[in-house]
Structure formats: C-alpha cells, structure tokens
Amino acid sequence: MDARTLHEMKMTAYHRAVLRRMCSNPDLKRRVVQHLEDLMHRQPDMAPVWEAWCALLDRPEAEAVADLQADSVEGKRLRMVSPVTAVLYPAERAMVWRCVGWLIFLHHYLAAAADLGLDLEEQAAILGLDGAEIGTWSHAPPERMAEERLHGLRQVITVRHILTILKPVLSERRQWLETVNPDWEASPLALLCRGEGAVVCDHLARQVGPRLRAADLPRC
C-alpha cells in the first residue's frame, strides 16, 4: 500500500471514528458546531467548506460516512479541511486514534477475506461469529471485538499476506486453500474453519521463509 493510499485510509477512518463518537457524545457535537460557527466568522472565504460540514453533521451516521468516503473533490475536501481535531480533548483524541487503528486492521481483514474468496459462511466458521453480522462490517464496522475473536482475523490476514508471496496469481491462492494436504488429510480452508488456523499459518511461514526479501520484512 502506497503512502498516499494509507493517508487517505487513515483520514477516512479518523472521521468515521469521530462521527461515531459524536453520536454517543452530544457535548462533542456541540463543540464542533460551536467551532464551525466561529470559523464562519474568522474564515469567511472557507464558508462553502464549513457549510458542507454543518450539513454533514445533520445527516444520519451512515450517510455522513458515505459523504466523507466519497472519492470526489467534495469528499477529499471534507477530509482534508476538518473542524474536528481542534475541539477534541486529549483523552478523546487518543480514543479516536485507537479506533482508527482498529478500523484499518478491519479493512485489512476484509481485503484479505475478499482476496481469498471467503464467503460469509466460511468467515463465520473461522471467526466463530454470525455471518450476517460479518456482512455488515463494510458499512457498519463494530467498535471493538473480544480478544479471542481477533485470532481468526489475524490468521486470515497472515494467510493472505504469505500466499501473495508464494502464489501471486489470485486464482491459485483460492485453489491452494481448497486442495487437500495429505499430511493433514484436510484442506487448509477446512483447518481454518475448524479453529486450526495456527497449523496453516505455521506451515506457510516455513514455506515462505527462504523466499523472503528485505522488502517483505517489517521495518523498525
């Protein structure tokens, strides 16, 4: 992922987290509105942006998030010129950035699940969650998740990451998941679905070790 894409993702996740926080914290919304009124007087040349933000705050959360995520001039302007950060208390800012980290992690999971062709039933088996709930994550992500549920998400991300190195062709990755391994008498996907994803991840780690390049390793 290039730096520009990551920055856009962070900004979108940041404002999504703030909008969600405002829904549960009327005082935060009041401070943002008050700050917008002040900006209207101090920076009248930016009035169209401040007016767009005022309109955004009056919309339902899902619609407001859609506007912020829009790949358009208006959407990018809303993300880049934001009245929110200035009114956040330090504890609120820390909470929002924790939420940003979670949303980006969830984005990586959803991208990995899509890349591996995992349907909702398979994801439900891997994560131990309801498939219908998982199906809402792209537009209504959960605020948090129990630690024991995170193992499945990490395993899916790990499997996808290593397979992109071992098998650059998309169709080959899904084929590998579905092919029975004689040593396991089951396919990697079957192991993932019955809670034995650690076996799959360890196997892939041994396979990829000799092929790792400097660019594949984490940076300090």
Question: Which functions belong to the PLM regions below?
Answer:
Residues 56, 66, 80, 87:
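Heme-based O2/NO sensor domains and their adjacent alpha-helical segments
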